[in-house]
Amino acid sequence: MDIAIQHPWFKRALGPFYPSRLFDQFFGEGLFEYDLLPFLSSTISPYYRQSLFRTVLDSGISEVRSDRDKFVIFLDVKHFSPEDLTVKVLEDFVEIHGKHNERQDDHGYISREFHRRYRLPSNVDQSALSCSLSADGMLTFSGPKVPSGVDAGHSERAIPVSREEKPSSAPSS
C-alpha cells in the first residue's frame, strides 16, 4: 500500500486558503504585498511563516468581559464615525452594525461594512445600557448586572453611540 506524504511546504503555501482564516475579523484594512502574492511569501524558505500574532493584533477583534457587576464589549471600529454605527438590543442580543459608503482614500475608493451580534447575559439591566466611541476608535458597550431574581427588562431598543474626546482605556490584546 502506498501512502502519500505531503511536504509541510505545501500546507504553508496554501495557508491563506484554509478555512482557519474564514473567521478573521478584518474590517477592511489595507492590503499588504504578501496578501496579494501569498505563494511567493511562503516560497522564500520552507521555514518562513508569517506571524499570526501581528495579524490578530491588527484585525479589529472584539473583547467581551463579563464581571460580577457589569458586562462590557470592546470593539475596534477605527474606520467608522458614530453616524456610521448602529447599536440595537433585540431581546437577549446586542447587534452592532457599521457601514460607510464608498469614499476615496490613499489607494483608491473603499467601502466598509460589518455586523456583530453578542448574547447578553440574562442578568444585565437593559434599561441602563450605554455605548461610547473613543477618540482612537474603540467602541465600548456596557451595562450593569442586577442581582439574581430581579427583572432585567427585555425589549427592543436602539442605543445611541456617544463620542468621547479621550483615547480608550481598553486593554490592548
Swiss-Prot record:
Keyword Ribonucleoprotein: no
Region (Disordered): 144-173
One Pfam assignment: Crystallin
Modification(s) after translation: Acetylation at Lys-70 may increase chaperone activity.
Segments of skewed composition (Basic and acidic residues): 153-167
Binding site for Zn(2+) 3: 154
Gene Ontology CC: one annotated term: nucleus
Subcellular localization: Cytoplasm; Nucleus
Tree of life domain: Eukaryota
Residues with PTM Phosphoserine: 45, 122
CDD domains in the record: ACD_alphaA-crystallin_HspB4 (cd06497)
Annotated GO MF terms: identical protein binding; metal ion binding; structural constituent of eye lens; unfolded protein binding
Key word Cytoplasm present: yes
Residues engaged in binding Zn(2+) 2: 107
Residues modified by glycosylation: 162
GO biological process terms, semicolon-separated: actin filament organization; apoptotic process involved in morphogenesis; embryonic camera-type eye morphogenesis; lens development in camera-type eye; lens fiber cell morphogenesis; microtubule-based process; mitochondrion organization; negative regulation of apoptotic process
N6-acetyllysine: residues carrying this PTM: 70, 99
Positions of post-translational Deamidated asparagine modification: 101, 123
Function: Contributes to the transparency and refractive index of the lens. Acts as a chaperone, preventing aggregation of various proteins under a wide range of stress conditions. Required for the correct formation of lens intermediate filaments as part of a complex composed of BFSP1, BFSP2 and CRYAA.
Subunit structure: Heteromer composed of three CRYAA and one CRYAB subunits. Inter-subunit bridging via zinc ions enhances stability, which is crucial as there is no protein turn over in the lens. Can also form homodimers and homotetramers (dimers of dimers) which serve as the building blocks of homooligomers. Within homooligomers, the zinc-binding motif is created from residues of 3 different molecules. His-100 and Glu-102 from one molecule are ligands of the zinc ion, and His-107 and His-154 residues from additional molecules complete the site with tetrahedral coordination geometry.
Protein name: Alpha-crystallin A chain
Native species: Canis lupus familiaris (Dog)
